[in-house]
Amino acid sequence: MTVSLTTAELAKYIDATALKADTSEADVRRLVAESREAGVKSVCINPVWVPLVAAELADSDVLTCTVIGFPLGANTSEVKAFEARQAIDAGADEVDMVIDVAAARAGDRARLVSDVRAVAEAAHADGPAGDGGALLKVIVETALLDDDAIVLACEAAVEAGADFVKTSTGFSTAGATVEHVALMRRTVGEGIGVKASGGVRTREDALAMIEAGATRIGASSALAILGSD
């Protein structure tokens, strides 16, 4: 392990998440307060919580992130694009969309590109107030794909305008692995972000993902990861 980061430096890699169906308003408010204190990169919540989180974080450097087509990716592209634009208009700075997993498994590059492009165009469009768009992360759900399909999904995401590729929703059969992060980094090169999400629970887990090429970490256990230098 050659990566060495202070707690403050590591915090800037982390999207602190609360994405379970039973997440309450009290849970969200607690996550926001803890995330502000820790100085993480973003708070990632389901779209229903975007207005609250964006308002609570308005005077901080912590960004508001939400999820699109989550967790299955089985919505139509039009629905995903609408969901993304609605979330951005409500205050989201970043959106994490789930790909059409079936298209990736079938090797259908054109369908993948079309799906991601619809959301990329919605995410990157200037809003009605002229306040710009949002960063787009594309979840490929690595646990459901072989290596060839992971490469295809990452290539399609980049072609379609993604800013990041992301390993997992955290709601499938497995989460991020060092091997998949490294494969995704090799595939997209240095100009695109790579987010490791799902099963990253300790500081050692996070540093291993960063060593493999991750530039963002999604974690529901952000405070545990940041617990000590």
Swiss-Prot record:
The keyword Repressor does not apply. Transmembrane segments: none annotated. It comes from the Bacteria. InterPro entries: Aldolase_TIM, DeoC, DeoC/FbaB/LacD_aldolase, DeoC_typeI. One of its GO terms (cellular component) is cytoplasm. The active site is at D96 (proton donor/acceptor), K166 (schiff-base intermediate with acetaldehyde), K195 (proton donor/acceptor). GO terms for biological process: 2-deoxyribose 1-phosphate catabolic process; carbohydrate catabolic process; deoxyribonucleotide catabolic process. Its EC number is 4.1.2.4. It is found in: Cytoplasm. It is an enzyme of class 4 (lyase). It catalyses: 2-deoxy-D-ribose 5-phosphate = D-glyceraldehyde 3-phosphate + acetaldehyde. Pathway: Carbohydrate degradation; 2-deoxy-D-ribose 1-phosphate degradation; D-glyceraldehyde 3-phosphate and acetaldehyde from 2-deoxy-alpha-D-ribose 1-phosphate: step 2/2. Pfam families: DeoC. Keywords: Cytoplasm, Lyase, Schiff base. One of its GO terms (molecular function) is deoxyribose-phosphate aldolase activity. Catalyzes a reversible aldol reaction between acetaldehyde and D-glyceraldehyde 3-phosphate to generate 2-deoxy-D-ribose 5-phosphate. Belongs to the DeoC/FbaB aldolase family. DeoC type 1 subfamily. HAMAP family: DeoC_type1. This is Deoxyribose-phosphate aldolase. It comes from Micrococcus luteus (strain ATCC 4698 / DSM 20030 / JCM 1464 / CCM 169 / CCUG 5858 / IAM 1056 / NBRC 3333 / NCIMB 9278 / NCTC 2665 / VKM Ac-2230) (Micrococcus lysodeikticus).
